[in-house]
Amino acid sequence: MSERQQLTNARGERIAIVSGLRTPFAKQATAFHGVSALDMGKMVVNELISRSELDPKLIEQLVYGQVVQMPAAPNIAREIVLGTGMDISTDAYSVTRACATSFQSTVNVAESILTGNMEIGIAGGSDSSSVLPIGVSKKLAHALVDLNKARSFGQKLSIFRRLGLKDLLPVPPAVAEYSTGLSMGQTAEQMAKTYNISRADQDALAHRSHTLATETWNAGKLAEEVMAAHVPPYKAFIDRDNNIRENSKLESYAKLRPAFDRKHGSVTAANSTPLTDGASAVLLMSEGRAKALGYTPIGYIKSYAFTAIDVWEDMLMGPSYATPMALKRAGMELEDLTLIEMHEAFAAQTLANMQMFGSKKFAEEKLGRNRAIGEIDMSKFNVLGGSLAYGHPFAATGTRLITQVCHELKRRGGGTGLATACAAGGLGAAMIVEVE
């Protein structure tokens, strides 16, 4: 495990998170039905620049991510530059790290600033579950390539004769992990059984998340970090997340059937995140450049870590591996944190990680530590609600977490906060921010 990180540039300046913004998050096929991830990305980056009153020519790089790729626009970052008011000379490239994608884009920009290669950049991510790349079967794809090479009508006819009716059916994007064949929901169900997570506890966490998110919106706490999004044909707009159960009642959660193991399961649609559309972004600068331009940053990056574990062994345990590494690099312990933001992909996954944070056995056997990461103080944990309520556009969640924890720390007078997430492929991400 790496020792303490020194996240300052050659002049001793920290990485400033100047501001962050996101679209409202919307359930699949609702407010953003027909709006691509690229269009949502352009929306949020344009608005972020506008609100920051920053000359676009000063932005040296955009690193942006997407999980559900658009074949027509594989480099979403560059398309955002070309499709907004940004200067065409702005460098741009795309990244993907499953549900930790915008953690990665943020770190990439931060590292470029740390090396002195630049001083101002934007990072973020966007995903649409409503505009999907619908593919074709392998046999049809093979046949289409052969058709392109065929010269005669007879050759083309023989190629068509190889196909059956089922080969002509469209193929939606895979929801299963490529290596295991398991969906994320099946993995969460597996974790619920491994760690004895009860249905009642899962439902209680989901109810808490929706209740806190409702209170957060009603208190106006998200006004600075969520934009109003106007969508074609521009007769309506969305300015609030539409997955939140504003009248959440705990007893109603018990009525839903298990979604992934019908007979013996406990993971339901109510204690899982739904397929979601949305985009988010953060503006990063060197501390000196931010102050020279008159900005008061919402926070600074103190440390970060990425980890990977076996996909066959409860692969959504990323926070339990990445968090202790980020804490060590920051020279901190869990109890030193003011706030903790953990991505709630599923209530089962979240509760399993929370359980392992407090497990000395897990720490000794899996982390090589002689003490547990620490028991989570619920008064610090996801205090504004989490992904179970807000939703989860895969590539957008990381920068939502980072922005949200910075703003809440600011409201509380400063401190340090953890943002952490699991990701497909057994990946994990954690970032510690400090706010003055």
Curated annotation (Swiss-Prot):
The keyword Ion transport does not apply. One of its GO terms (biological process) is fatty acid beta-oxidation. CDD domains: thiolase. Its main location: cytoplasm. It catalyses: an acyl-CoA + acetyl-CoA = a 3-oxoacyl-CoA + CoA. Keywords: Acyltransferase, Cytoplasm, Fatty acid metabolism, Lipid degradation, Lipid metabolism, Transferase. The keyword Acyltransferase applies. Pathway: Lipid metabolism; fatty acid beta-oxidation. GO terms for cellular component: cytosol. Its EC number is 2.3.1.16. The active site is at C99 (acyl-thioester intermediate), H392 (proton acceptor), C422 (proton acceptor). SUPFAM superfamilies: Thiolase-like (SSF53901). One of its GO terms (molecular function) is acetyl-CoA C-acyltransferase activity. InterPro entries: Ac-CoA_C-AcTrfase_FadI, Thiolase, Thiolase-like, Thiolase_AS, Thiolase_C, Thiolase_CS, Thiolase_N. It comes from the Bacteria. Belongs to the thiolase-like superfamily. Thiolase family. NCBIfam families: AcCoA-C-Actrans, FadI, PRK08963.1. Catalyzes the final step of fatty acid oxidation in which acetyl-CoA is released and the CoA ester of a fatty acid two carbons shorter is formed. HAMAP family: FadI. This is 3-ketoacyl-CoA thiolase. It comes from Shewanella piezotolerans (strain WP3 / JCM 13877).
